[in-house]
């Protein structure tokens, strides 16, 4: 039975331009973030440089968005909204309280800095859709909320921590991959659903877990992102073995921007190497739970073309989890328990530093 009390869940994602007119704004927000674009420059110079880079990159990025067939924008906001709707239904089925689920983005619109998104507490809960902790995603989100409300939300009861190390997430992801290869997923629920399948037994192919890369300077600052990715992959691979999978398991990093050193090996390097050996290749987006430019265009088109060019025998893109029912129920369970048990600074533990207004700061 649902009571009159209404609780709000705010589903946070990185963001993406919904239309071509939002591309430069999205890029400006992205490169203005000190946890993403963290060059040792005075603030006014860093922001000026961020605006310059956004303006310069916008035309090139626009061509990539145009190629996806979503009106020149990214489907990420809409895909996140689908997850929000599914999660709202799941929460209201499980809870005696009424839940209203909103979508907010760290970059672009709807922007989580807007007034409609309230202070984190037990009645207003924030759930960032980042499986693994990184300074550039989770810590960035927490810093935005800290700037807005004057305190870090960790420990407030209104924040759901990253979930990529949870054994339940591993088993759900493994079953999702199994159901994809055995044609059990509803195709109409996934964008550009990959119709092609490897012309070999899926249990013997080479499975590449591709994560979004980050600059190595973040790792050197204490970001344990690579460790989290590796543990996520190990957990999923162990679960996949229960479905008979005994092929190759590989970790790589995609979406590098600029000349600085990033996490390696790159997915381009990994796929090139495997394809030259004549391998059957599948790519799973380990750090993404919503399909967008990096999964549909970069993995689905660019990496596929690279596989054929380098002599690979087959290539398949595995979709992101999206509204996979078990995943939505998993998130609902996380939301209902929130982070009331957290009694330490996860930012320092996972990202190398505490925020200024951390409630657990020594």
UniProtKB/Swiss-Prot annotation:
Annotated pathway: Porphyrin-containing compound metabolism; protoheme biosynthesis; protoheme from protoporphyrin-IX: step 1/1
Taxonomic superkingdom: Bacteria
GO molecular function: ferrochelatase activity; metal ion binding
GO CC annotations on file: cytoplasm
Pfam (any one): Ferrochelatase
Compartment annotation: Cytoplasm
Catalytic activity: heme b + 2 H(+) = protoporphyrin IX + Fe(2+)
Record's keyword annotation contains Hydrolase: no
InterPro entries: Ferrochelatase, Ferrochelatase_AS, Ferrochelatase_C, Ferrochelatase_N
Residues given in the record as Fe cation binding sites: 212, 294
Segments forming a coiled coil: none
Keyword Metal-binding: yes
EC numbers for this chain: 4.98.1.1
Any one GO biological process: heme biosynthetic process
Keywords from the UniProt entry: Cytoplasm, Heme biosynthesis, Iron, Lyase, Metal-binding, Porphyrin biosynthesis
Top EC group: lyase
Similarity field: Belongs to the ferrochelatase family.
Protein's job: Catalyzes the ferrous insertion into protoporphyrin IX.
Protein name as catalogued: Ferrochelatase
